[in-house]
Regions:
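Active-site neighborhoods and metal-handling regions in enzymes and metal-associated proteins
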Residues: 1-116
Length: 116
């Protein structure tokens, strides 16, 4: 489920001593680059939509060194951490296939790639 994905991200991030932004999430990918479903970077296992064959999602954890809270600057676009801590954004696009998840954005030489 999407809850399984979010719970796994949250566990890895928080176990490392960081926090996950909750207001910004990943998304489905299809004819438009940003589609349903929303893919939160936190959650509870077993909850949320099922990951069905053919689904393509962008998993986009935004990880803060400090607390998880954010704020938007006066320009209405720029988002910063509320406590001024550093933050990083990661992204992979994943397809749900009959054989399991396939990371579409993995490059040769990336950790966990078949070439490794």
């Amino acid at each position: 489920t999407l809850g399984d994905v979010g719970a796994a991200i949250q566990a890895v991030v928080e176990d490392a001593g960081y926090s996950v932004i909750r207001e910004l999430v990943g998304h489905g990918v299809g004819f438009a680059p940003h589609e349903e479903p929303h893919v939160p970077n936190f959650g509870r296992r077993g909850q949320g939509a099922e990951l069905e064959e053919g689904l393509v999602i962008a998993i986009e954890p935004m990880v803060n060194v400090g607390r998880r809270h954010i704020r938007t600057l006066a320009d209405g676009w720029t988002v910063v951490t509320a406590d001024g801590s550093l933050s990083a954004h990661f992204e992979h696009t994943v397809a749900v296939t009959p054989e399991g998840p396939r990371i579409l954005t993995r490059r040769s030489g990336d950790r966990g790639s078949k070439e490794e």
